[in-house]
């Protein structure tokens, strides 16, 4: 049962449902849990996603990868003028998300896992990467460097990571800031870092902190 507790995404029904699966099957725990979630997601499809109108389905497919979202970010990613109202519709449904302290919303872990599953089944990897790019562009415009870098990384967009790191190094950011950026410097090949003086400067700052 510890195996289920560790992978229940905070969903209260996972434990009793998992108990039923584990007592009626001889499959290994990993395969059994995978089958349980597949059955659960199929039920969610029938009871939730498949019943929504095309606008709501599109909205969820655009935002399925995000654990947190603000109305402004949702509008930037989806391109929908009705993004704020659609988020309120989701909030009224009661299961998808809860308000956070920043005026946005945190998606419930088990619903986030479900929406990512829907997105993977219905969308191309290029589409998913594009949504991360849009989110990164939004947070970049808001001056939120770490969030922008995180989403460019999840989009696999090393070109934009390179540009952002060069821009940040030119600002002569604090040593503490460079320490936070180390993981993104590590994504770049050594020859790329060596080709740009500002990146070499940033890397030297990072090395001095060790």
Question: What is each PLM-predicted segment?
Answer:
Residues 2-7, 13-27, 58-62, 72-77, ...:
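C-terminal helical "lid" of AAA+/P-loop NTPase domains
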Residues 27-30, 80, 120-125:
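Short, polar/flexible loop-turn hinges at active-site or ligand-entry regions and domain interfaces
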Residues 8, 41-121, 130:
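C-terminal boundary/linker of central alpha/beta nucleotide-binding cores
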Residues 13-18, 55-59, 86, 131, ...:
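Residue-level detector of well-ordered alpha-helical segments, enriched
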Residues 22-44:
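Conserved C-terminal helix/linker of AAA+ ATPases
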Residues 125-208:
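Extended alpha-helical scaffolding segments used for macromolecular assembly and cargo binding
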